[in-house]
């Protein structure tokens, strides 16, 4: 028999009593015969249990990506499609060992049958106009730091309504920094989804690299910096990595296009006016080095992309955030918060949002959004592991401030620490997109439990492996548990996988 891609499709029998109790589930290798031969084809979904809808509709899936890791495991990402259009459903991932055995299948296995209920009647131009109208703006009145503010405008299927939509991504810096995802019905022009995705808390060979020193918020420390000299000025531009690291001064504006690369007449950036920029520049380099040296990830996107930091955002802004392209730091109001670039955990947290964006792409709502926040917190700890707290360095009141977060004791700082405390909040800005910050305390506590059982070094490796290869964009807490178990098994064996399971079960995730 022939398929479009590969010949010889094998149908696999499964062990009995397989439990498909949740929508997004996974299948372990113990449920697959050891002699299965991987086909690198959606037909692999025929190996699923009869209770999985994806089994009967495997022909509706398309392979989006194929990646081989350093263990030789190949990871395939599949997405549901209909009439040539992809959906916004969760992906399905199939993981194949070097000897062509399927070791793991995960994602939303209860999907497959899809019938589009509308037609395309409005133009792309009309859809973009309606997207801007939905946020009270027009394309002519927003400014983007780089290029067109319309970054994506593809037609996909909204899985909830089964309708074709223009999926439009807007990123701009003026009149305020924003990163919107807006879905416009392709027939009626109705807005089906609207969410601001901000994640809060040219080289010239003649230009030479120079060493420099600077002082950040901690005036007692001198930080070594890499800078670039052009003519008679030294700029906070680090060219010692494959990806350029640049630090800009916004001078209290909110439009990143007004940002200027921080410069000085000497290579001593020690005056107080440079402190926020020095911290941002120094810590961005340290985060780059962490991912490069510990996880072999070249910059945040894995491709040597640039890291741009903007300091002095707005006036007394109590925030720092990744906007989908760069990181922006407020100066704090000085009463409650110091400049946000002065905390290595916060810099690590925000830049990890970029790593998440370029890997699992965890959607910023509900449990997947809480996982997004949690993984950013946990890697913030991995990057600065001297304590279990995130953000205490920017709090004027230090440990007494209730707005910091603790991986060890989330409930001490107004976060849930167990599923019994989980809050199902509205998927709105007022509801914190389903309580992503409050509920992230649950996976944070699970991470703490894992670290105490396996140690930091093993835990950071399995967390990165799960993030890069196993988590899907709509992953729930149970999916994260299983993804981390599989990553632990890959790297350290069954005993480590069991300890990961225990760590999550201790917070009520079974």
UniProtKB/Swiss-Prot annotation:
The record's free-text note on cofactor binding: Binds 1 zinc ion.
Coiled coil location: none
GO biological process, one term: proteolysis
Cofactor dependency: Zn(2+)
Main location: secreted
Domain of life: Bacteria
A Pfam family annotated for this UniProt entry: Peptidase_M4
Signal sequence segment: 1-24
Record keyword Secreted present: yes
Protein name (database record): Zinc metalloproteinase
């Amino acid at each position: 028999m022939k398929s479009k891609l590969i010949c010889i499709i094998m149908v696999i029998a499964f062990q009995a009593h397989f439990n498909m109790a949740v929508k997004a589930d996974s299948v372990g290798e113990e449920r697959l015969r050891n002699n299965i031969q991987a086909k690198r084809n959606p037909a692999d979904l025929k190996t699923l249990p009869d209770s999985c809808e994806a089994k009967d509709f495997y022909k509706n899936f398309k392979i989006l990506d194929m990646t081989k890791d350093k263990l030789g495991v190949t990871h395939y990402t599949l997405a549901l499609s209909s009439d040539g259009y992809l959906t916004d459903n969760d992906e399905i991932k199939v993981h194949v060992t070097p000897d062509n055995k399927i070791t793991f299948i995960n994602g939303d296995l209860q999907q497959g049958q899809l019938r589009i209920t509308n037609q395309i009647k409005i133009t792309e131009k009309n859809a973009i106009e309606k997207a801007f109208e939905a946020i009270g703006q027009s394309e002519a009145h927003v400014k983007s730091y780089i290029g067109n503010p319309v970054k994506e405008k593809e037609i996909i299927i909204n899985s909830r309504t089964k309708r074709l939509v223009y999926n439009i991504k807007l990123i701009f810096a003026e009149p305020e920094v924003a990163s919107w995802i807006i879905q416009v019905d392709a027939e009626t022009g109705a807005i089906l989804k609207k969410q601001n995705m901000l994640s809060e808390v040219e080289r010239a060979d003649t230009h030479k690299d120079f060493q420099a020193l600077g002082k950040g918020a901690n005036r007692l420390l001198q930080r070594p910096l890499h800078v670039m000299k052009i003519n008679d000025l030294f700029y906070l531009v680090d060219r010692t990595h494959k990806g350029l690291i640049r630090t800009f001064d916004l001078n209290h504006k909110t439009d990143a296009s007004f940002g200027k690369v921080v410069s000085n007449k000497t290579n001593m950036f020690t005056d107080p006016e440079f402190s926020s920029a020095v911290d941002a520049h120094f810590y961005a380099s340290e985060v780059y080095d962490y991912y490069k040296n510990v996880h072999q990830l070249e910059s945040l996107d894995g491709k040597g992309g640039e890291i741009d930091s903007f300091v002095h955002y707005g006036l007394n802004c109590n925030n720092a955030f990744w906007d989908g392209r760069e990181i922006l730091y407020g100066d704090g109001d000085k009463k409650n918060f110091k400049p946000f670039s002065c905390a290595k955990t916060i810099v690590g947290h925000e830049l990890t949002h970029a790593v998440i964006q370029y890997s699992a792409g965890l959607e910023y709502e509900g449990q997947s959004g809480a996982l997004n926040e949690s993984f950013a917190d946990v890697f913030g700890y991995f990057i600065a592991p001297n304590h279990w707290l995130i953000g205490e360095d920017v709090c004027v009141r230090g440990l007494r401030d209730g707005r910091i977060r603790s991986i060890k004791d989330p409930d001490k700082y107004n976060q849930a620490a167990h599923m019994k405390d989980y809050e199902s909040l509205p998927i709105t800005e007022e509801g914190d997109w389903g309580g992503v910050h409050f509920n992230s305390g649950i996976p944070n506590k699970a991470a703490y439990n894992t670290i105490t059982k396996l140690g930091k070094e093993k835990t950071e490796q399995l967390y990165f492996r799960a993030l890069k290869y196993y988590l899907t964009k709509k992953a729930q807490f149970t999916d994260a548990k299983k993804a981390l178990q599989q990553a632990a098994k890959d790297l350290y064996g069954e005993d480590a996988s069991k300890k990961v399971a225990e760590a999550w079960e201790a917070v009520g995730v079974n």
